[in-house]
């Protein structure tokens, strides 16, 4: 405890000496006063040499001898308070010396040159003759042995000063090291923050530059557009003004000509001689008539001078400009997601179109296979009727030539007419050019209707089908096959000759007008009544070849 007091007293003495030294500094040379020290009327002190220098500087025209002023009298200002000091005939030597300050300077110099006192071993405050040699662990203060035996620390735990000194010194060293390390880390963080500040400034400067460039680009676009639109208005203005000025010149010329003609007429009206008047009146009247008829007053349409077509509405653009803002990362991500969704949607549409094309192609193949079945059926019937044709060649030769036919649902359609239907030509069909006994009028009408309005079959556009829906195809074809087989058996057994078959067929086709009318009625109402099955034997002609 006494050690701390001694340290405090020493520190206080040092502070007192420092304050005293500040008071002993000359305001001119800024050093400690040198003897002799003079006191001014304002109670400030100066070195006599400094006072002489400042006096000489204030009075440069006074003669000097050996660095001192010879002439008497003069004045100068105090450097501390700027008070004017008036000197008598003795000059600066007439100022009084400050002996007190000189004595204080001597004492200060003696004390400052004295060697410093070494601090002795601290003594106990309660026992002045006892040195402090132990440390109380409970009270955490150094003390003496008598305090431990008889004094206030007799019930406390104590330890030698050396052990406690080493322990606390090591703790203090560790604490200092921790502080130094933390200071290093803090300094590193400060450096990083300074770098971050520089980076922020650089990025902001770059962004400002980019923003200014973009706005300058917008300004240039606006200026360019403004110039173009202004030029358009100017061109229209010049055109309209030129047109109006042309009309003005035209009307002015006409007015001038008419005025001259009127003046001539008025002068001619004063002609006293009737003969002269009549001689020239016809010519003048003709000129007046021509002038009144030839001139056509061209008027400017109403609103010609109004330029409403150049009105500009910038409300939408102004709204867009006011909504200009910085782009955000979320908006960019949303835009990328929309683009990805659009790409996936397009891929899905392409896949679906490819599947539809495959389905359509498979449907066309199935339809072509179904269309080939009647052709195969006709070939079988033709092969089976060979013996019948061999037994009656005359009847075959008597038959008129006809085109090959294709047995379809409800009717016999020539293959030539099928090709005609696909190409949509206007030429006559085989049914129209054949014998009327073989092809009655109602069949020709139906064939013509079939050619002009071919029914649409999905997947098989080249096929001609008239009659019930495709669901009834199988039943109708099976009935045709059964009937053809029965006719074939009858022909082979000889129950009917070929001529009789041909005659009956011709008779069947050449029916009464009532039958034809009924057939036409049935052809007209194909939606409500199934078509008749008509078989032609024109395929017999091919066997002669």
Swiss-Prot record:
Targeted for degradation through the proteasomal and lysosomal pathways in the presence of SUMO3. GO terms for biological process: diapedesis; innate immune response; leukocyte migration involved in inflammatory response; macrophage migration; positive regulation of non-canonical NF-kappaB signal transduction; protein K48-linked ubiquitination. Residues 219-258 form a coiled coil. A zinc finger (B box-type) spans 119-161. The keyword Transcription regulation does not apply. Its main location: nucleus. Keywords: Coiled coil, Cytoplasm, Metal-binding, Muscle protein, Nucleus, Transferase, Zinc, Zinc-finger. Its EC number is 2.3.2.27. This is Tripartite motif-containing protein 55.
